[in-house]
Amino acid sequence: MTEHDLSLWLEQWVSAVTGEAEIDPSKPLEAYGLSSRDAVILSGELENLLGVKLDPTIAYQYPTIEALAHALTASQEDKQGVRGARAGRMQTVSASPAQRDIAIVGRAGRFPGAANADELWALLLDGAVTTGPLPAGRWSEYAGDPYLRTKMKEEATDGGYLDDIASFDNEFFGLSPLEAQNMDPQQRIMLEVAWEALEDAHIPADRLRGTPVGVFVGSSGNDYGMLIGADPAQAHPYALTGASSAIIPNRISYAFDFRGPSMNVDTACSSSLVSVHHAVRALRDGECDVALAGGVNILANPFASLMFSELGVISPTGGIRAFSDDADGIVRSEAAGFIVLKRVADAVANEDEILAVIKGSATNSDGHSNGLTAPNPDAQVDVLERAYADAGIDPATVDLVEAHGTGTILGDPIEATALGAVLGRD
């Protein structure tokens, strides 16, 4: 089948599925309202039409009829050219490992069913499941709203919840009870976790006062700000800073007199990882000598969970089954964590206990994919290649990968395909 013939077939298929009379082959398929399930059906019908095995995410790899028709009819030489271009990105860097490599010298966190990192490790070893129903009293501020009360009963609200998001020793951090009451729980918890992480690293916070310590926090969404906004009559002016995501890291820098970069990172699901990436770069560039990097997520109001559930993103069974035929969606969760980072040379010189080493990192954007929230397979391949190149590591030597693992019909195949393209190239 020629590229022209396949393009016509695709136009007719999209028209039949969507009811649109005029189909523009250069327009993203997502613009016609095709769902992720439609994309999977399309890949199956293309397999039958062309007699070849196709990835179910093919319509996300090539998001327009024009691109899809060209890719499926491209010559072998064209495909080899693409592989050659990708291989060119895999050139590794050469520099002093002691200066480029970053040591993890401390860690602390709070997790569903685990009050610290050691308890989390025990849960992982046991294969324990710590997700469950919405805790009693959570989101009670909305119980008087008939619509929300009904939605909270109808939609899936099972998740991973921390046992206690309210307790806080305000005097320890020099805060008045009034200011503490008007602070996002994420600010309160991360203050405590920062202190605990430095304790774990055997670095007294007082010893770092006035020095270039960086604080990088991944935090997506502002549940507490929405909660405050829903009843402004009950809010105090302290809520201006108390509900600001930017203040989560800056509260720590202020409390401990840290003078390095202090920033909140919001890149949705990847926020914590990207905060670590920025910390690595800041240490390499000499912007700080010690860095706290991590993330926090507290589900302080129901809106995002209810909307995700209504969209069909959240697992109706409350199960986490990434990369499984039974996968039926994500499960939202709370957590907070920090790692303490130093350049390897500094950690060795100080005789710190090195828990692990970060050899490289990379970040990018999907660009214009098949929908604002849709993953881009080629961009995932690119960021993996850049990360391994930055680390100076041959992907063929990698034995273990920690995956995103959305547990969704398209997210899992796209991630698996990208990992296979980079790690399984040979």
Task: Go through the PLM ranges and name each one.
Residues 2-93:
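Phosphopantetheine-dependent thiolation modules in NRPS/PKS and related acyl-activating systems
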Residues 96-426:
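Condensing-enzyme catalytic core of the thiolase-fold
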Residues 1, 20-21, 30, 34, ...:
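A short N-terminal beta->alpha junction/helix N-cap motif
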